[in-house]
């Protein structure tokens, strides 16, 4: 278990590494980095190479056992930034702990399948065990997972295998869902034996899963965030799923918990999706039928604007595509805040 600090900084482009200097100015060394989690100004789709660029410039500059998780798409008021998860100097307790890890690399035909979910469940369970926390203490499992490209589909066909889908964009959703099912098993929301059934049909979801797909990796990068019972905690995490893209009440409820503690919000992590039913509550929406803009981009803009307005901060992590990450049409939500000791 690693007690952690969380710091975030704006970036001027996906290749901007100036936050590293700011991190050092704040008294931290790059060796303290557990994870770099960022929002980059791409389209968040299959051909979003802003994620690839960000990963390429950051990974050589952080410890080999650290992870990068970059989510493309800063639609609306969302502002590009990076959030550092840092080992607390001297392992001083802060109230939050984190662990990071990788699954093995996946063969193209395994992406979006129950094998991916099983590997995520195994790795995540191991991280939770290493941390010495209970699933109830876990507030978020953040994952970057692979997707299918045209080249990978050709490889699958050449091997006589069958891909989970032949649509590269849909593969993002299938990979996110498989990862979310794995998380659900790891935190005890479903039994491990139910993974194949859960992956084969929609409907399973985890309140603690936040998964983002990308072409920049072949494995899953995993970050587990948990609260500890340390006395005099300074950092706190609270979480609950949003019921839909208009669920201000859930955000306000978490903000109220921070307010009661006299806390200052450090970061918000949220998933967003266009309700597949075509309605938000009783109102019809057109996010799923827009031929110009993918629904995930609409959802990021809508939920990003809602949360940013409520917390008065545009440097928040809002990721589109919430398959299995909160109820259908909603999404997982985790708020981190800081109190004075």
Curated annotation (Swiss-Prot):
What is this enzyme's EC?
A: 3.5.2.15
Q: Where is this region: RU C?
A: 235-341
Q: Which residues of this protein are annotated with the site description Important for substrate specificity?
A: 296
Indicate how activity is controlled. Inhibited by barbituric acid.
Location of the active site: 144, 212 (nucleophile)
Q: Which InterPro entries match?
A: AtzD/Barbiturase, AtzD/Barbiturase_RUA, AtzD/Barbiturase_RUB, AtzD/Barbiturase_RUC
What is known about its subunit structure? Homotetramer.
Q: What is this protein called?
A: Cyanuric acid amidohydrolase
């Amino acid at each position: 278990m690693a007690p952690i600090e969380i710091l975030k900084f704006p970036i001027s482009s996906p290749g901007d590494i100036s936050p590293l200097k700011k991190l050092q100015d704040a008294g931290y060394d790059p060796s303290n980095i557990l994870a770099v989690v960022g929002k980059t100004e791409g389209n968040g789709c299959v051909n979003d190479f802003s994620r690839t660029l960000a990963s390429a410039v950051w990974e050589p500059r952080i410890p080999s056992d650290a992870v990068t998780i970059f989510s493309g798409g800063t639609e609306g008021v969302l502002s590009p930034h990076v959030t550092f998860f840092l080992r607390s100097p001297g392992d001083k307790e802060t109230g939050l702990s984190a662990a990071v890890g990788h699954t093995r690399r996946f063969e193209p035909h395994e992406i979006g399948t129950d094998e991916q979910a099983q590997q995520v469940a195994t790795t995540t369970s191991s991280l939770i065990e290493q941390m010495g926390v209970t699933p109830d203490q876990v507030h978020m499992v953040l994952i970057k997972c692979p997707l299918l490209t045209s080249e990978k589909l050709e490889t699958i066909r050449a091997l006589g295998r069958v891909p989970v889908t032949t649509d590269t964009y849909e593969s993002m959703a299938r990979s996110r869902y498989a990862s979310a099912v794995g998380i659900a098993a790891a935190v005890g929301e479903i039994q491990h034996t139910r993974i194949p059934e859960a992956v084969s049909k929609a409907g399973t979801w985890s309140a603690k899963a936040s998964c983002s797909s990308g072409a920049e990796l072949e494995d899953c990068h995993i970050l587990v965030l948990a609260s500890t019972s340390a006395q005099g905690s300074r950092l706190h995490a609270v979480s609950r799923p949003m019921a839909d893209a208009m669920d201000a009440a859930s955000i306000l409820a978490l903000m109220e918990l921070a307010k009661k503690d006299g806390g200052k919000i450090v970061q918000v992590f949220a998933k967003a999706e266009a309700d597949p039913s075509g309605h938000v509550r009783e109102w019809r929406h057109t996010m799923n039928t827009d031929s110009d803009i993918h629904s995930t981009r609409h959802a990021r803009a809508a939920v990003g604007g809602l949360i940013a307005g409520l917390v008065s901060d545009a440097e928040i992590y809002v990721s589109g595509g919430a398959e299995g990450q909160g109820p259908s049409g909603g999404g997982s939500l985790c708020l981190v805040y800081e109190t004075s000791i």
